[in-house]
Design a protein with these regions (language model features):
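N-terminal cap/leader regions of alpha/beta-hydrolase-fold enzymes
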Residues: 1-280
Length: 280
């Protein structure tokens, strides 16, 4: 697995609210489970950003999808305990921010760089594609075959690091009923998009540092021209990479885009996942 695509993959705002779900071992993986207030309309498996399944941001998002859409939501530890610690965000902010003094430049920033590398390099080694892809695919197959969940429609919601895998799941018949990917990274154009065969919704900003706006327009055009699969690509004005998960609540524009992208995902799953149990 290559290095994170841009600085925005490792920066953002970390929420402090307390998630309300539970943690269980499901199909061999520790999993955060968000249970809806009513009978579930379907099941959504979240594939998180680079900071993994334990962050408040991802867990609170799982709670919202569950409560607002009546979905059972699974957020598994696909990284097997190797996600960079949330403090990596602060390290990246410090490295990229202005230096208030010469001492910061010549002493502290080199230390922060070493600390950052000590978190990022092990993640890259332990979460290369050959390791995590089978883990992700096997989990979805297990959900499909589990008598407790086989009757539910299955959606995949991937963010940043996880967006790529959601899109790849949508390239396989029978893996998921539909997918939603927010600001995906490490995508190949056009092949990753040409292979999609399940309903796919994409949310991305027009100032995303991973997929530039020219490439976004190419993706829009390619998917709009395909009549063999349901898809949508929504471009959010002024939204940065990571906005759907790590938007700073003090930034009105980023927060608005995050809320709208969540609504987008719920509308998509409402069309293609809710009540679709047993349809592979």
């Amino acid at each position: 697995m290559a290095a994170p695509s841009c600085k925005n993959c490792l920066t953002g705002y970390m929420k402090t609210e307390k998630p309300t779900g539970t943690v269980s071992t499901i199909h061999g993986l520790e999993t955060y489970v968000a249970t809806p207030p009513n009978a579930p309309q379907g099941l959504i498996v979240m594939i998180p950003d680079i900071f993994g399944w334990e962050t408040n941001n991802s867990r609170l998002l799982a709670d919202s999808l569950s409560q607002d859409g009546d979905y059972l939501v699974y957020l598994p530890d696909f990284m097997n305990g190797t996600a960079p610690p949330p403090g990596t965000m602060e390290l990246m902010d410090s490295l990229l921010g202005p230096s208030p003094s010469l001492a910061t430049t010549i002493f502290y920033k080199p230390i922060w760089a070493v600390q950052f590398a000590s978190a990022a390099i092990p993640f890259m080694a332990r979460n290369r594609d050959a390791v995590v892809r089978p883990r992700i695919y096997d989990f979805h197959r297990a959900v499909r075959s589990d008598a407790a969940t086989a009757h539910l429609g299955l959606g995949s919601a991937g963010y940043c690091w996880g967006g790529k895998y959601t899109i790849h799941l949508c390239q396989e018949e029978g893996m998921v009923d539909a997918g939603f990917a927010a600001h995906p990274s490490k995508m190949a154009f056009p092949e990753d998009w040409e292979k999609v065969c399940r309903p796919l919704s994409v949310a991305i900003g027009d100032v995303d540092m991973v997929i530039g706006i020219e490439d976004v327009r190419k993706i829009e055009g390619l998917m709009a021209g395909r009549k063999d699969v349901e898809s949508e690509v929504r471009v959010y004005e002024g939204a940065k990479h990571g906005f759907a998960v790590r938007a700073d609540p003090r930034d009105e524009g980023q927060t608005r885009s995050a809320v709208e992208s969540q609504r987008q995902s719920l509308e998509w799953f409402g069309r293609f996942v809710a009540g679709k149990g047993g349809k592979k």
